[in-house]
Amino acid sequence: MKLSLSSPPYADAPVVVLISGLGGSGSYWLPQLAVLEQEYQVVCYDQRGTGNNPDTLAEDYSIAQMAAELHQALVAAGIERYAVVGHALGALVGMQLALDYPASVTMLVSVNGWLRINAHTRRCFQVRERLLYSGGAQAWVEAQPLFLYPADWMAARAPRLEAEDALALAHFQGKNNLLRRLNALKRADFSHHADRIRCPVQIICASDDLLVPTACSSELHAALPDSQKMVMPYGGHACNVTDPETFNALLLNGLASLLHHREAAL
């Protein structure tokens, strides 16, 4: 699996791995790259079955497989210890990595994540699946911003959204891969295992997220032994895109306080 690695800003700089959500594209993290690369070696990638890592996914594709293939790719690239920043599905992969490879994961950041899928989130995906079956890729892509962004943010950026739609349609991961990745997301359940995650965890959520209720992050915070939770008042599900200044400040402060503190203790 292909990875994109930035140059380390100094010798032995900590590694931060960015894992996007259901869309799977590493470019999702573009608003974070410049600030992170000043202090960390940053790893981005298109998830298997998407972008520049095309593949046909098995029907039983799982979050555990997503975690294993990423860890193997990191080890092959010479990276054995790393922090993980995951958005939604990416946060699930991050938790799986922390469970399966505890010696490797130094810290986890969960952005609008959850322990197991909330009934509201499941309902949103059911609506989106119906759109996919009835209207194909175009209907899925055109509906996607409604679940990602606040209404006023979208209204002020109509040309940008049109360009994003065209790009997403041109690089659509395919119906079968999308549904198999979505099914993996829906099957994931960390409610009985989260207390075994021992690395520090920063939880970031947005209070106006239409797709994932903030209660999901509260449940994560209660279940994870070494976690702290920050709530952004605005930004929607893709709060790192819509309000990068606020998000980046929270992320950088979290990495500095949790990751560096852990490294100093080792």
Swiss-Prot record:
Write down the EC number. 3.5.1.-
Q: Which domain of life is it from?
A: Bacteria
Show the catalytic activity.
Answer: carbamate + 2 H(+) = NH4(+) + CO2
| GO molecular-function terms, A-Z | hydrolase activity, acting on carbon-nitrogen (but not peptide) bonds, in linear amides
EC top class, in one word? hydrolase
Q: Name one Pfam family in it.
A: Abhydrolase_1
Its function, per the record, reads:
Involved in pyrimidine catabolism. May facilitate the hydrolysis of carbamate, a reaction that can also occur spontaneously.
Tell me where in this chain the AB hydrolase-1 domain is found. 14-115
A single Gene Ontology biological process assigned to it is: nitrogen utilization
Q: Which UniProt keywords apply?
A: Hydrolase
Q: State what protein this is by name.
A: Putative carbamate hydrolase RutD
**Which NCBIfam families does this entry report, sorted A to Z?**
RutD (TIGR03611)
Hydrolase found in the keyword field: yes
Similarity field: Belongs to the AB hydrolase superfamily. Hydrolase RutD family.
